[in-house]
């Protein structure tokens, strides 16, 4: 099962969707603007990648955080902020579940055609 997470109006997410469709790869799209980010889902992301790769510090949302929050970025604070503002995550997030019985999953961040080509070869 393949799930692409992001927001529908993000150009990078659109590129990933276009690439997946052009290569006849079926996927489910999870739009953070229409579906809430849950504790469970965010916890799953954190298990697969750490905050240093998940958090988009170049985003407008991050830049708009108060200095107090930016200087107190503990795991709990980040978790709380990302739940409230999922646009703090890098996009898109591509979750591939290879074997649900064995709980084998991979989470890929961002989109580059070469990377997607390597993932799906």
Residue ranges of model-derived segments:
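Thiol/selenol-based redox catalytic cores and closely related redox-interacting motifs
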Residues: 35-121
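Local sequence-structure signature of Cys/Sec-based thiol-disulfide redox active-site neighborhoods
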Residues: 1-23, 27-32
């Amino acid at each position: 099962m393949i799930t692409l997470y992001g927001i529908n109006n993000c150009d990078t997410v659109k590129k990933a969707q276009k690439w997946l469709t052009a290569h006849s790869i079926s996927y489910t799209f999870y739009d953070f603007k229409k579906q809430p980010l849950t504790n469970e889902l965010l916890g799953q992301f954190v298990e697969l990648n750490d905050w240093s790769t998940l958090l988009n510090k170049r985003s407008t949302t991050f830049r708009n955080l108060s200095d107090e929050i930016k200087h107190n970025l503990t795991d709990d604070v980040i978790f709380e902020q990302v739940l409230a503002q999922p646009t703090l995550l890098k996009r898109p997030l591509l979750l591939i579940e290879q074997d649900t019985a064995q709980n084998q999953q991979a989470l890929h961040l961002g989109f580059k055609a070469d990377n997607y080509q390597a993932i799906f070869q």
